[in-house]
Amino acid sequence: MTEYKKVIAQNKKAIFNYFIEEILEAGIVLKGSEVQSLRQGKASIDESYASDNGHEVFLYNCHITEYEKANRFNHSTRRPRKLLLHTKEIKKIIGKIRIKGYTLVALSMYFNKNNKVKVELGIAKGKKLYDKRATIKEKDWKKDQSRLIRQK
């Protein structure tokens, strides 16, 4: 049985710029106006990343547009947002992030079947320029293959 996900935002650059080694799911602490803005699909996680702050993990650089009808109770668009994880998961993440070259990148943000906002995080290692070129070559080759198959 497939799990229901209503995707709000995706980070397609992360898959191109990083080797994703492990994928995790985390809840996120939001204000009411942020949830309303997310329901309208007004969010961007293109340059967002997560980092530890002591014994907690926060999501940085996640842009959630201000909700128009919230007036003075509105939120800051790029404020750090706390991620909800189990203690074991936090320790595991912090251990892997502290290794040189690894980072925690937001891959997607979505509503699950209970209408809770979840963030899909990836423990990632940065790609070098030649790795990116190899990825582009693979994509081009797959496109050429599909064209050749369609022509026959």
From Swiss-Prot:
GO terms for biological process: trans-translation. GO terms for cellular component: cytosol. The keyword Translocase does not apply. CDD domains: SmpB. Required for rescue of stalled ribosomes mediated by trans-translation. Binds to transfer-messenger RNA (tmRNA), required for stable association of tmRNA with ribosomes. tmRNA and SmpB together mimic tRNA shape, replacing the anticodon stem-loop with SmpB. tmRNA is encoded by the ssrA gene; the 2 termini fold to resemble tRNA(Ala) and it encodes a 'tag peptide', a short internal open reading frame. During trans-translation Ala-aminoacylated tmRNA acts like a tRNA, entering the A-site of stalled ribosomes, displacing the stalled mRNA. PANTHER family: SSRA-BINDING PROTEIN (PTHR30308:SF2), TMRNA-BINDING COMPONENT OF TRANS-TRANSLATION TAGGING COMPLEX (PTHR30308). This is SsrA-binding protein.
